[in-house]
């Protein structure tokens, strides 16, 4: 997936990918106000480019909680809630359903 110019709730995840909006994506996923795209799991420039449209950042670190270097985001005034991908997907879907200005980065689970 290069770019999907909409945000969708995540319908399911696992086996190394995500399902949303009658589509699927294999690999890590970045969800920004402008849309959804593949993510390498370490580049936070997409969040920074759209920071004026983001109130909440959720990062899913895979099947287990991992530390991530978020200094780049924090230097731009963005603070991320880091949790497992399962918890992050649930949090993202809830906030998206409430029409909150949320962005997310999800590391894939179970390749």
Specify the residue positions occupied by each region the protein language model found.
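C-terminal structural segments of small proteins and small subunits
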Residues: 79-107
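Non-catalytic interface/targeting segments
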Residues: 1-45, 97-111
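Short active-site-adjacent helix-start/loop capping segments
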Residues: 38-40, 65-69, 90-91
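Short amphipathic alpha-helix with an adjacent loop that forms part of the alpha/beta core around
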Residues: 45-51
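Mid-chain, well-packed structural core segment of small domains
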Residues: 51-85
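Short glycine-/small-residue-rich flexible loop motifs, especially phosphate/cofactor-binding loops
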Residues: 15, 70-72, 92
């Amino acid at each position: 997936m290069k770019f999907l110019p909409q945000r969708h709730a995540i319908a399911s995840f696992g086996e190394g990918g995500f399902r949303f909006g009658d589509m699927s994506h294999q690999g890590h996923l970045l969800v920004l106000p402008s849309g959804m795209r593949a993510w390498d799991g370490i580049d936070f420039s997409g969040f920074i480019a759209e920071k004026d449209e983001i109130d909440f950042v959720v990062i899913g670190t895979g099947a287990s909680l991992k530390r991530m270097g978020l200094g780049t985001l924090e230097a731009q005034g963005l603070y991320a809630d880091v949790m497992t991908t399962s918890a992050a997907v649930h949090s993202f879907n809830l906030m998206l359903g409430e029409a909150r200005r949320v962005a997310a980065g999800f590391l894939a689970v179970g390749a």
